[in-house]
């Protein structure tokens, strides 16, 4: 083909190398919408470059959230991103897969066969906790009115340990509930069951038991809590119930410690939430909540919505969202089965125990949680340790190798205790764990041989290190 002077394809940008493009040679607008479009390959690279200096998700040992899924799961989820989970009349088979997931969880959590359990997916455990809390509040209100209690006299209250996740504080603020916090202490790094009933009155909507405290990974003694609640209920017209926040533990414990009584086997446990994107092994974000029986989910919280040609019951706080995470959850259930989950979680537990030994052998730390119940390794510096550096400095050292390992104070009455914690997930294999252990030992060596630089006129409450 012949071309004239005007046909030199000077506007054919595919001939221009990406890093020679006009977009790459000028500053992109960051807080206003740019005027002209650009090629997708250039937009992709620009966005990718903006994220380049972030941490590697696989090395983020601060998060419980899943950072790896199989390629087949990723393909399946990418193919279903456009499906709206709320459009159940348009995507009936997707709704069926969600229903299957609810039934699988009900079986895992030992829902009684003679009761009518029900449940739903959520965006994550935070939404699930909101729904669980709302169900308790509305049920308390209905029962209180029947008893003739003046529900306007004071605010209803919820009882939980100081190891709560922030979603519970949000719930109490959003829905005008008084959060009564049972403080943890050095002897009780989970809920102190003996102190719980110091906080109970007729305005208590329920008690939250935590299966995997975010700070430490420890479990509340839910079986003992259930015993105490049963004693209370036998002698009081006001009936207490227990909600289990199993964001971390409810998709782990059934596989590695199935004999532990914490779930619907306990009489007063009426609802359970979990995060599918934690030990359910799905990318963020999907959560689940189940109620033991329909009597524990007040009817006024269930809405019949006419949408896109069909009527459907819904109670979620969120509405439109992709169904891909629900489908990813069902893929995992189908792919792994009980034995697959058990093998994965047992391996993760083994990794946690190995790393806990590494921490302990260093001689610097007291282990708070060794990963035996939940693969969370948590520790603090020994009380008699005489060193200049802190756990915050150790966190900085590990970050230099890409590892994100948080250090932070415990809540409330233990706020003077600084701890460090790392989460072992399914994608932390033994070989990678060995690399982390080596970096951990190197970090300690560097801290011991660092020259301390004091700041603020010689005071040593703020300092750094040179190497």
Regions inferred by a protein language model and the residue ranges of each:
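PLP-dependent enzyme catalytic core of the Aspartate aminotransferase-like
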Residues: 232, 414-467
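A common structural junction motif
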Residues: 398-406, 441-448
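Conserved PLP-binding catalytic core of the aspartate aminotransferase-like
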Residues: 365-402, 463-465
């Amino acid at each position: 083909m012949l071309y004239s002077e005007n046909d030199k394809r000077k506007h054919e940008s595919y001939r221009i190398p990406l890093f020679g493009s006009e977009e790459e040679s000028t500053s992109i607008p960051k807080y206003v919408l740019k005027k002209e479009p650009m090629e997708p390959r250039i937009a992709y690279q620009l966005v990718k470059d903006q994220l380049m200096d972030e941490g590697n998700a696989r090395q983020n040992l601060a998060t419980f959230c899943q950072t790896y899924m199989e390629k087949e799961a990723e393909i399946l989820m990418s193919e279903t991103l456009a499906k709206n989970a709320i459009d159940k009349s348009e995507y009936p088979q997707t709704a069926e897969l969600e229903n299957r997931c609810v039934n699988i969880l009900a079986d895992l959590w030992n829902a009684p066969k003679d009761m009518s359990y029900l449940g739903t997916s959520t965006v994550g455990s935070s939404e699930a906790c909101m729904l669980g809390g709302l169900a308790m509040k509305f049920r308390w209100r209905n029962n209180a009115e029947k008893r003739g209690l003046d529900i306007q006299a004071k605010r209803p209250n919820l009882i939980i340990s100081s190891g709560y996740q922030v979603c519970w504080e949000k719930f109490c603020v959003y829905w005008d509930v008084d959060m009564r916090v049972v403080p943890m202490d050095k002897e009780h790094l989970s809920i102190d069951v003996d102190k719980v009933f110091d906080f109970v009155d007729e305005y208590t909507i329920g008690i939250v038991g935590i299966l995997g405290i975010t700070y430490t990974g420890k479990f509340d003694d839910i079986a003992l809590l259930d015993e105490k609640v049963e004693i209370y209920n036998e002698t009081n017209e006001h009936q207490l119930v227990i909600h289990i926040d199993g964001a971390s533990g409810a998709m782990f414990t059934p596989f590695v410690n199935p004999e532990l009584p914490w779930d619907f086997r306990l009489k007063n446990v009426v609802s359970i939430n979990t995060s599918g994107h934690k030990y359910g092994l799905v990318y963020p974000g999907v959560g689940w909540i189940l109620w033991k029986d329909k009597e524990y989910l007040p009817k006024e919280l269930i809405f019949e919505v006419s949408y896109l040609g069909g009527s459907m019951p819904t109670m979620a706080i969120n509405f439109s969202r992709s169904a891909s995470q629900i489908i990813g959850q069902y893929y995992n259930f189908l792919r792994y089965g009980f034995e697959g989950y058990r093998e994965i979680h047992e391996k993760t537990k083994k990794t946690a125990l190995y790393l806990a030994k590494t921490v302990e052998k260093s001689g610097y730390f007291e282990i708070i949680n060794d990963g035996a119940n939940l693969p969370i390794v948590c520790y603090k510096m020994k009380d008699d340790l005489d060193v200049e550096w802190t756990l915050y400095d150790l966190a900085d050292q590990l970050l230099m190798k890409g590892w994100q390992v948080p250090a932070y104070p415990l809540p409330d009455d233990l706020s003077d205790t600084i701890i460090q914690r790392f989460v072992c997930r399914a994608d932390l294999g033994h070989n990678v764990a060995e690399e982390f252990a080596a970096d951990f030992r190197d970090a300690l060596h560097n801290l011991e041989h660092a020259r301390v630089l004091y700041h603020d006129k010689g005071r040593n409450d703020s300092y750094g290190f040179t190497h």
